[in-house]
Amino acid sequence: MRSQWLKNRKNDKTPTQMYYAKNGIITEEMRYVAKIEQMDAEILRSEVARGKTIIPANINHTNLVPMGIGRSLKCKINSNIGSSSVSSGVEEEVEKLKISIKYGADTVMDLSTGGDLNEIRTQIIKNSTVPIGTVPIYQIIHDVGSIENLTISQMLKTIENQAIQGVSYFTIHAGFLLEFMPLVAKRKMGIVSRGGSLMATWMMKNHKENPFFTAFDEILEICAKYDVSLSLGDSLRPGCIYDASDAAQISELKILGDLARRAWTKNVQVMIEGPGHVPFNEIASNMQLERVLCDDAPFYVLGPLPTDIGAGYDHITSAIGGTMAAFSGASMLCYVTPKEHLGLPNAKDVREGIVAHKIAAHIADVALGKKGAIERDHAMSDARYNFDWNKQFELSLDPDRAKEYHDETLPQEVFKEAEFCSMCGPKFCAYKISREISKNSCEFYKECK
Protein backbone atom coordinates (compact mmCIF):
# COMPACT_ATOMS: atom_id res chain seq x y z
CA MET A 1 0.00 0.00 0.00
CA ARG A 2 2.78 2.46 0.90
CA SER A 3 5.15 1.65 -1.96
CA GLN A 4 3.62 4.14 -4.40
CA TRP A 5 3.19 6.78 -1.70
CA LEU A 6 6.87 6.52 -0.81
CA LYS A 7 7.94 6.46 -4.45
CA ASN A 8 6.26 9.81 -5.00
CA ARG A 9 8.27 11.29 -2.11
CA LYS A 10 11.62 9.52 -2.62
CA ASN A 11 13.55 12.71 -3.41
CA ASP A 12 12.32 14.64 -0.37
CA LYS A 13 15.19 15.67 1.90
CA THR A 14 13.24 15.34 5.17
CA PRO A 15 10.68 12.57 4.65
CA THR A 16 9.08 12.65 8.11
CA GLN A 17 5.38 12.86 8.82
CA MET A 18 6.07 15.79 11.14
CA TYR A 19 7.92 17.71 8.42
CA TYR A 20 5.06 17.31 5.98
CA ALA A 21 2.50 18.20 8.64
CA LYS A 22 4.37 21.38 9.60
CA ASN A 23 4.37 22.41 5.95
CA GLY A 24 0.62 21.96 5.59
CA ILE A 25 0.84 18.69 3.66
CA ILE A 26 -1.63 15.92 4.45
CA THR A 27 0.19 12.71 3.52
CA GLU A 28 -1.50 9.50 2.42
CA GLU A 29 -0.57 8.04 5.81
CA MET A 30 -2.38 10.89 7.56
CA ARG A 31 -5.48 10.44 5.39
CA TYR A 32 -5.50 6.72 6.12
CA VAL A 33 -5.16 7.19 9.88
CA ALA A 34 -7.79 9.93 9.89
CA LYS A 35 -10.24 7.61 8.15
CA ILE A 36 -9.60 4.78 10.61
CA GLU A 37 -9.94 7.14 13.58
CA GLN A 38 -13.07 8.79 12.12
CA MET A 39 -11.57 12.26 12.36
CA ASP A 40 -10.91 15.16 10.00
CA ALA A 41 -7.59 14.79 8.17
CA GLU A 42 -6.73 18.46 8.67
CA ILE A 43 -7.19 18.12 12.43
CA LEU A 44 -4.90 15.10 12.42
CA ARG A 45 -2.29 16.98 10.37
CA SER A 46 -2.34 19.75 12.96
CA GLU A 47 -1.90 17.21 15.77
CA VAL A 48 1.13 15.67 14.04
CA ALA A 49 2.63 19.09 13.31
CA ARG A 50 2.40 20.06 16.99
CA GLY A 51 3.80 16.75 18.26
CA LYS A 52 0.56 15.68 19.93
CA THR A 53 0.11 12.68 17.64
CA ILE A 54 2.68 10.50 15.91
CA ILE A 55 2.43 8.18 12.92
CA PRO A 56 5.42 5.83 13.31
CA ALA A 57 6.18 4.79 9.74
CA ASN A 58 9.78 4.18 8.66
CA ILE A 59 10.15 4.87 4.93
CA ASN A 60 11.76 1.42 4.50
CA HIS A 61 8.83 -0.50 6.01
CA THR A 62 6.80 -0.55 2.81
CA ASN A 63 4.23 -3.18 3.85
CA LEU A 64 3.29 -1.21 6.98
CA VAL A 65 -0.35 -0.23 7.47
CA PRO A 66 -0.30 3.30 8.98
CA MET A 67 -1.57 3.90 12.51
CA GLY A 68 -1.49 6.83 14.88
CA ILE A 69 -0.68 7.32 18.55
CA GLY A 70 -2.04 10.34 20.39
CA ARG A 71 -4.46 11.42 23.08
CA SER A 72 -7.17 12.46 20.61
CA LEU A 73 -7.08 9.02 18.95
CA LYS A 74 -8.21 5.68 20.32
CA CYS A 75 -5.78 4.22 22.86
CA LYS A 76 -3.27 1.83 21.32
CA ILE A 77 -1.60 -1.37 22.54
CA ASN A 78 2.01 -2.47 22.14
CA SER A 79 3.16 -6.07 22.33
CA ASN A 80 6.73 -6.91 23.37
CA ILE A 81 8.36 -9.95 21.80
CA GLY A 82 11.98 -11.00 21.44
CA SER A 83 14.51 -13.70 22.10
CA SER A 84 16.81 -13.97 25.09
CA SER A 85 20.24 -15.54 25.44
CA VAL A 86 18.64 -18.72 26.80
CA SER A 87 15.36 -18.99 24.91
CA SER A 88 13.64 -18.58 21.54
CA GLY A 89 14.73 -17.95 17.95
CA VAL A 90 13.56 -16.62 14.58
CA GLU A 91 10.57 -18.93 14.09
CA GLU A 92 9.33 -18.47 17.64
CA GLU A 93 9.52 -14.68 17.41
CA VAL A 94 7.74 -14.55 14.06
CA GLU A 95 5.02 -16.73 15.58
CA LYS A 96 4.71 -14.31 18.51
CA LEU A 97 4.47 -11.46 16.00
CA LYS A 98 1.63 -13.18 14.16
CA ILE A 99 -0.18 -13.86 17.43
CA SER A 100 0.31 -10.21 18.41
CA ILE A 101 -1.22 -8.92 15.18
CA LYS A 102 -4.05 -11.47 15.23
CA TYR A 103 -5.20 -10.42 18.69
CA GLY A 104 -4.97 -6.71 18.09
CA ALA A 105 -1.51 -5.31 18.89
CA ASP A 106 -1.16 -1.90 17.24
CA THR A 107 2.64 -1.93 17.41
CA VAL A 108 5.20 -4.60 18.28
CA MET A 109 8.60 -4.15 19.90
CA ASP A 110 11.42 -6.58 19.18
CA LEU A 111 13.37 -6.76 22.43
CA SER A 112 15.67 -9.59 21.36
CA THR A 113 18.93 -9.93 23.25
CA GLY A 114 20.12 -13.34 22.05
CA GLY A 115 20.65 -15.20 18.78
CA ASP A 116 21.01 -13.63 15.34
CA LEU A 117 19.47 -10.26 16.17
CA ASN A 118 19.65 -8.88 12.63
CA GLU A 119 17.94 -11.92 11.13
CA ILE A 120 15.26 -11.98 13.82
CA ARG A 121 14.52 -8.30 13.21
CA THR A 122 14.58 -8.68 9.42
CA GLN A 123 12.01 -11.47 9.53
CA ILE A 124 9.82 -9.64 12.03
CA ILE A 125 9.70 -6.49 9.87
CA LYS A 126 9.17 -8.55 6.71
CA ASN A 127 6.16 -10.28 8.26
CA SER A 128 4.69 -7.26 10.02
CA THR A 129 1.99 -4.83 8.90
CA VAL A 130 2.27 -2.89 12.17
CA PRO A 131 5.12 -0.56 13.21
CA ILE A 132 8.10 -2.30 14.78
CA GLY A 133 10.02 -0.71 17.63
CA THR A 134 13.36 -1.66 19.16
CA VAL A 135 15.68 -0.77 22.02
CA PRO A 136 18.99 -0.30 20.14
CA ILE A 137 21.16 -0.56 23.27
CA TYR A 138 20.39 -4.31 23.37
CA GLN A 139 22.02 -4.95 20.01
CA ILE A 140 24.81 -2.48 20.71
CA ILE A 141 25.86 -4.44 23.81
CA HIS A 142 25.28 -7.75 22.03
CA ASP A 143 27.64 -6.68 19.23
CA VAL A 144 30.43 -5.07 21.29
CA GLY A 145 30.47 -7.79 23.94
CA SER A 146 30.22 -5.72 27.10
CA ILE A 147 29.13 -2.28 28.23
CA GLU A 148 32.77 -1.23 28.70
CA ASN A 149 33.34 -1.51 24.94
CA LEU A 150 30.49 0.80 23.98
CA THR A 151 31.50 3.78 21.85
CA ILE A 152 29.36 6.54 20.39
CA SER A 153 30.44 5.63 16.85
CA GLN A 154 29.36 2.01 17.34
CA MET A 155 26.12 3.20 18.91
CA LEU A 156 25.26 5.43 15.94
CA LYS A 157 26.21 2.71 13.46
CA THR A 158 23.83 0.22 15.07
CA ILE A 159 21.03 2.78 15.26
CA GLU A 160 21.35 3.62 11.56
CA ASN A 161 21.51 -0.05 10.56
CA GLN A 162 18.24 -0.68 12.37
CA ALA A 163 16.71 2.37 10.69
CA ILE A 164 17.77 1.02 7.30
CA GLN A 165 16.10 -2.30 8.17
CA GLY A 166 12.77 -0.52 8.67
CA VAL A 167 12.38 -0.03 12.42
CA SER A 168 9.68 2.61 12.96
CA TYR A 169 10.53 3.70 16.49
CA PHE A 170 13.50 3.52 18.83
CA THR A 171 13.44 3.48 22.60
CA ILE A 172 16.40 5.71 23.44
CA HIS A 173 17.45 6.09 27.09
CA ALA A 174 18.75 9.64 26.69
CA GLY A 175 17.03 11.31 29.64
CA PHE A 176 18.96 9.53 32.39
CA LEU A 177 21.77 11.93 33.33
CA LEU A 178 24.84 11.26 35.45
CA GLU A 179 23.63 13.80 38.02
CA PHE A 180 20.60 11.61 38.80
CA MET A 181 22.66 8.73 40.22
CA PRO A 182 22.39 9.95 43.86
CA LEU A 183 18.59 9.95 43.50
CA VAL A 184 18.67 6.29 42.51
CA ALA A 185 20.51 5.40 45.73
CA LYS A 186 17.47 6.46 47.76
CA ARG A 187 15.20 3.90 46.12
CA LYS A 188 13.97 0.57 47.38
CA MET A 189 14.52 -1.10 43.99
CA GLY A 190 17.02 1.14 42.21
CA ILE A 191 16.90 0.89 38.41
CA VAL A 192 14.58 -1.73 36.89
CA SER A 193 14.94 -0.69 33.24
CA ARG A 194 17.41 -2.91 31.37
CA GLY A 195 18.51 0.00 29.19
CA GLY A 196 18.68 2.28 32.19
CA SER A 197 20.85 -0.13 34.17
CA LEU A 198 23.25 -0.44 31.23
CA MET A 199 23.51 3.34 30.93
CA ALA A 200 24.15 3.64 34.66
CA THR A 201 26.95 1.10 34.41
CA TRP A 202 28.57 2.94 31.49
CA MET A 203 28.34 6.34 33.19
CA MET A 204 29.78 5.06 36.46
CA LYS A 205 32.66 3.25 34.79
CA ASN A 206 33.56 6.14 32.49
CA HIS A 207 32.60 9.06 34.72
CA LYS A 208 31.01 10.64 31.65
CA GLU A 209 27.54 11.77 30.62
CA ASN A 210 25.03 9.35 29.10
CA PRO A 211 26.22 8.75 25.50
CA PHE A 212 22.65 8.82 24.16
CA PHE A 213 22.28 12.31 25.62
CA THR A 214 25.68 13.39 24.31
CA ALA A 215 24.95 12.13 20.78
CA PHE A 216 21.28 13.11 20.73
CA ASP A 217 21.64 15.50 17.78
CA GLU A 218 23.31 12.79 15.69
CA ILE A 219 20.52 10.37 16.61
CA LEU A 220 17.97 12.94 15.46
CA GLU A 221 19.72 13.20 12.09
CA ILE A 222 19.33 9.45 11.58
CA CYS A 223 15.69 9.50 12.64
CA ALA A 224 14.88 12.40 10.31
CA LYS A 225 16.53 10.60 7.39
CA TYR A 226 14.34 7.48 7.69
CA ASP A 227 11.34 8.87 9.59
CA VAL A 228 12.02 6.85 12.71
CA SER A 229 10.02 8.07 15.69
CA LEU A 230 11.66 8.31 19.10
CA SER A 231 10.17 6.64 22.14
CA LEU A 232 12.07 8.46 24.88
CA GLY A 233 12.77 5.76 27.43
CA ASP A 234 12.12 6.09 31.13
CA SER A 235 15.29 4.55 32.54
CA LEU A 236 14.20 5.58 36.03
CA ARG A 237 10.64 4.30 35.96
CA PRO A 238 9.58 2.99 39.37
CA GLY A 239 9.88 -0.77 39.71
CA CYS A 240 7.71 -0.90 42.81
CA ILE A 241 4.94 1.28 44.18
CA TYR A 242 7.26 2.44 47.00
CA ASP A 243 9.44 4.24 44.43
CA ALA A 244 6.57 5.76 42.45
CA SER A 245 6.53 9.48 41.69
CA ASP A 246 9.92 10.01 43.34
CA ALA A 247 12.58 12.59 42.52
CA ALA A 248 14.47 10.24 40.19
CA GLN A 249 11.40 9.54 38.05
CA ILE A 250 10.30 13.17 37.82
CA SER A 251 13.81 14.52 37.19
CA GLU A 252 14.18 12.25 34.19
CA LEU A 253 10.68 13.13 32.94
CA LYS A 254 11.65 16.81 32.83
CA ILE A 255 14.66 15.98 30.67
CA LEU A 256 12.49 13.85 28.39
CA GLY A 257 10.33 16.91 27.82
CA ASP A 258 13.41 18.94 26.87
CA LEU A 259 14.55 16.20 24.48
CA ALA A 260 11.11 16.04 22.88
CA ARG A 261 11.25 19.74 22.12
CA ARG A 262 14.72 19.32 20.59
CA ALA A 263 13.45 16.48 18.42
CA TRP A 264 10.53 18.55 17.15
CA THR A 265 12.91 21.25 15.91
CA LYS A 266 14.44 18.54 13.68
CA ASN A 267 11.00 17.28 12.54
CA VAL A 268 11.38 13.99 14.42
CA GLN A 269 8.26 12.47 15.94
CA VAL A 270 8.35 11.66 19.65
CA MET A 271 6.44 9.80 22.32
CA ILE A 272 7.36 9.64 26.00
CA GLU A 273 7.66 6.41 27.96
CA GLY A 274 6.16 6.25 31.43
CA PRO A 275 5.84 4.14 34.55
CA GLY A 276 5.93 1.48 35.77
CA HIS A 277 4.62 0.57 39.22
CA VAL A 278 2.31 3.31 40.53
CA PRO A 279 -0.36 3.22 43.28
CA PHE A 280 -3.82 3.53 41.77
CA ASN A 281 -4.45 6.90 43.39
CA GLU A 282 -1.32 8.38 41.75
CA ILE A 283 -1.91 7.21 38.18
CA ALA A 284 -4.04 10.14 37.01
CA SER A 285 -1.64 12.74 38.42
CA ASN A 286 1.28 11.00 36.68
CA MET A 287 -0.53 11.26 33.35
CA GLN A 288 -1.31 14.93 33.93
CA LEU A 289 2.28 15.71 34.93
CA GLU A 290 3.60 14.28 31.67
CA ARG A 291 1.26 16.51 29.69
CA VAL A 292 2.66 19.56 31.45
CA LEU A 293 6.37 18.65 31.39
CA CYS A 294 6.38 17.17 27.88
CA ASP A 295 3.96 19.51 26.09
CA ASP A 296 1.35 16.79 25.61
CA ALA A 297 3.58 14.47 23.59
CA PRO A 298 1.93 11.03 23.39
CA PHE A 299 2.47 9.09 26.62
CA TYR A 300 3.36 5.41 26.25
CA VAL A 301 3.08 3.62 29.58
CA LEU A 302 4.06 0.20 30.92
CA GLY A 303 0.95 -0.68 32.86
CA PRO A 304 1.11 1.03 35.25
CA LEU A 305 0.93 -1.77 37.81
CA PRO A 306 -0.90 -0.52 40.93
CA THR A 307 0.28 -3.43 43.10
CA ASP A 308 3.49 -5.43 43.39
CA ILE A 309 1.99 -8.76 44.48
CA GLY A 310 0.27 -9.95 41.29
CA ALA A 311 3.00 -12.35 40.13
CA GLY A 312 1.50 -14.77 37.64
CA TYR A 313 -1.43 -12.41 37.09
CA ASP A 314 0.35 -9.16 36.30
CA HIS A 315 -1.51 -8.88 33.00
CA ILE A 316 -4.54 -8.24 35.21
CA THR A 317 -2.85 -5.77 37.57
CA SER A 318 -1.42 -3.95 34.56
CA ALA A 319 -4.77 -3.81 32.76
CA ILE A 320 -6.39 -2.33 35.86
CA GLY A 321 -3.76 0.40 36.05
CA GLY A 322 -3.75 0.79 32.28
CA THR A 323 -7.47 1.53 32.22
CA MET A 324 -6.98 4.46 34.58
CA ALA A 325 -3.89 5.61 32.66
CA ALA A 326 -5.71 5.56 29.32
CA PHE A 327 -8.72 7.33 30.80
CA SER A 328 -6.39 9.97 32.25
CA GLY A 329 -4.49 10.66 29.04
CA ALA A 330 -2.10 7.83 28.10
CA SER A 331 -1.97 7.28 24.34
CA MET A 332 -0.56 3.75 24.26
CA LEU A 333 -0.34 0.90 26.75
CA CYS A 334 2.58 -1.49 26.70
CA TYR A 335 1.14 -4.87 27.47
CA VAL A 336 2.26 -6.97 30.40
CA THR A 337 1.92 -10.76 30.28
CA PRO A 338 1.28 -13.30 33.05
CA LYS A 339 5.03 -14.05 32.90
CA GLU A 340 6.03 -10.50 33.93
CA HIS A 341 8.73 -10.65 36.65
CA LEU A 342 8.90 -14.44 36.19
CA GLY A 343 10.27 -15.33 32.76
CA LEU A 344 10.21 -14.97 28.97
CA PRO A 345 6.62 -15.02 27.65
CA ASN A 346 5.57 -17.61 25.08
CA ALA A 347 2.89 -17.24 22.40
CA LYS A 348 0.10 -18.11 24.84
CA ASP A 349 1.30 -15.45 27.29
CA VAL A 350 1.47 -12.90 24.48
CA ARG A 351 -2.18 -13.57 23.63
CA GLU A 352 -3.25 -13.20 27.26
CA GLY A 353 -1.36 -9.93 27.65
CA ILE A 354 -2.67 -8.37 24.47
CA VAL A 355 -6.32 -9.16 25.11
CA ALA A 356 -6.15 -7.92 28.71
CA HIS A 357 -4.78 -4.58 27.54
CA LYS A 358 -7.13 -4.31 24.56
CA ILE A 359 -9.93 -4.56 27.12
CA ALA A 360 -8.32 -1.84 29.23
CA ALA A 361 -7.85 0.50 26.27
CA HIS A 362 -11.38 -0.10 25.00
CA ILE A 363 -12.93 0.63 28.39
CA ALA A 364 -11.13 3.97 28.45
CA ASP A 365 -12.10 4.74 24.84
CA VAL A 366 -15.77 4.14 25.66
CA ALA A 367 -15.58 6.29 28.79
CA LEU A 368 -13.90 9.10 26.83
CA GLY A 369 -16.43 8.94 24.01
CA LYS A 370 -13.89 8.05 21.33
CA LYS A 371 -15.56 7.66 17.94
CA GLY A 372 -16.25 4.07 16.94
CA ALA A 373 -15.69 2.65 20.43
CA ILE A 374 -19.09 2.13 22.06
CA GLU A 375 -20.75 0.99 18.83
CA ARG A 376 -19.10 -2.41 19.18
CA ASP A 377 -20.57 -2.79 22.67
CA HIS A 378 -24.03 -1.91 21.39
CA ALA A 379 -23.68 -4.45 18.59
CA MET A 380 -22.67 -7.09 21.14
CA SER A 381 -25.74 -6.30 23.26
CA ASP A 382 -27.98 -6.80 20.23
CA ALA A 383 -26.27 -10.08 19.35
CA ARG A 384 -26.64 -11.38 22.90
CA TYR A 385 -30.28 -10.45 23.21
CA ASN A 386 -31.00 -12.08 19.84
CA PHE A 387 -28.98 -15.23 20.64
CA ASP A 388 -26.74 -14.64 17.63
CA TRP A 389 -23.85 -16.71 18.94
CA ASN A 390 -21.57 -16.42 15.91
CA LYS A 391 -21.96 -12.65 15.94
CA GLN A 392 -21.09 -12.62 19.63
CA PHE A 393 -17.88 -14.54 18.93
CA GLU A 394 -17.01 -12.17 16.08
CA LEU A 395 -17.50 -9.04 18.18
CA SER A 396 -15.43 -10.32 21.10
CA LEU A 397 -11.89 -9.00 21.56
CA ASP A 398 -10.79 -12.64 21.55
CA PRO A 399 -13.24 -14.48 19.25
CA ASP A 400 -11.35 -17.76 19.57
CA ARG A 401 -11.57 -17.77 23.36
CA ALA A 402 -15.27 -16.87 23.34
CA LYS A 403 -16.04 -19.74 20.97
CA GLU A 404 -13.81 -22.16 22.89
CA TYR A 405 -15.63 -21.48 26.16
CA HIS A 406 -19.08 -21.74 24.57
CA ASP A 407 -18.19 -24.98 22.82
CA GLU A 408 -16.76 -26.68 25.91
CA THR A 409 -20.29 -27.72 26.89
CA LEU A 410 -22.35 -27.12 23.73
CA PRO A 411 -20.04 -27.89 20.78
CA GLN A 412 -22.66 -28.97 18.22
CA GLU A 413 -23.55 -26.49 15.49
CA VAL A 414 -27.22 -26.65 16.40
CA PHE A 415 -26.42 -24.80 19.64
CA LYS A 416 -25.11 -21.82 17.65
CA GLU A 417 -28.80 -21.02 17.11
CA ALA A 418 -30.05 -22.05 20.55
CA GLU A 419 -31.85 -19.52 22.75
CA PHE A 420 -29.80 -20.46 25.80
CA CYS A 421 -26.29 -21.41 26.92
CA SER A 422 -25.02 -23.95 29.45
CA MET A 423 -25.17 -21.46 32.33
CA CYS A 424 -28.96 -21.23 32.63
CA GLY A 425 -30.32 -23.76 30.16
CA PRO A 426 -33.55 -23.23 28.20
CA LYS A 427 -35.87 -22.70 31.20
CA PHE A 428 -33.93 -20.13 33.23
CA CYS A 429 -32.43 -17.89 30.54
CA ALA A 430 -33.15 -14.29 31.53
CA TYR A 431 -32.80 -13.05 27.94
CA LYS A 432 -35.35 -15.56 26.69
CA ILE A 433 -37.77 -14.78 29.52
CA SER A 434 -37.32 -11.04 28.99
CA ARG A 435 -38.03 -11.40 25.28
CA GLU A 436 -41.23 -13.26 26.08
CA ILE A 437 -42.28 -10.58 28.58
CA SER A 438 -41.60 -7.88 26.01
CA LYS A 439 -43.55 -9.73 23.33
CA ASN A 440 -46.55 -10.32 25.60
CA SER A 441 -46.51 -6.72 26.83
CA CYS A 442 -46.59 -5.45 23.27
CA GLU A 443 -49.53 -7.68 22.44
CA PHE A 444 -51.40 -6.63 25.60
CA TYR A 445 -50.90 -2.89 25.29
CA LYS A 446 -50.77 -2.84 21.48
CA GLU A 447 -48.31 0.05 21.66
CA CYS A 448 -45.16 -1.64 20.39
CA LYS A 449 -44.16 -1.67 16.75
Curated annotation (Swiss-Prot):
GO biological process: one example: thiamine biosynthetic process
Reaction it catalyzes: 5-amino-1-(5-phospho-beta-D-ribosyl)imidazole + S-adenosyl-L-methionine = 4-amino-2-methyl-5-(phosphooxymethyl)pyrimidine + CO + 5'-deoxyadenosine + formate + L-methionine + 3 H(+)
Any single Pfam family the record assigns to this protein: ThiC_Rad_SAM
EC number annotated for this UniProt entry: 4.1.99.17
Entry keywords, A to Z: 4Fe-4S, Iron, Iron-sulfur, Lyase, Metal-binding, S-adenosyl-L-methionine, Thiamine biosynthesis, Zinc
Class of this enzyme: lyase
Pathway per the UniProt entry: Cofactor biosynthesis; thiamine diphosphate biosynthesis
Cofactor note: Binds 1 [4Fe-4S] cluster per subunit. The cluster is coordinated with 3 cysteines and an exchangeable S-adenosyl-L-methionine.
Disulphide bridges, residue numbers: none
Chain positions recorded as Zn(2+) binding sites: 277, 341
Cofactor: [4Fe-4S] cluster
Binding site for [4Fe-4S] cluster: 421, 424, 429
GO molecular function, one term: 4 iron, 4 sulfur cluster binding
Binding site for substrate: 80, 109, 138, 173, 193-195, 234-237, 273, 300
Keyword Iron belongs to the record: yes
Subunit structure: Homodimer.
Record's function text: Catalyzes the synthesis of the hydroxymethylpyrimidine phosphate (HMP-P) moiety of thiamine from aminoimidazole ribotide (AIR) in a radical S-adenosyl-L-methionine (SAM)-dependent reaction.
Family: Belongs to the ThiC family.
PANTHER family xref list: PHOSPHOMETHYLPYRIMIDINE SYNTHASE, CHLOROPLASTIC, THIAMINE BIOSYNTHESIS PROTEIN THIC
Name the UniProt record assigns to this protein: Phosphomethylpyrimidine synthase
Organism this protein belongs to: Campylobacter hominis (strain ATCC BAA-381 / DSM 21671 / CCUG 45161 / LMG 19568 / NCTC 13146 / CH001A)
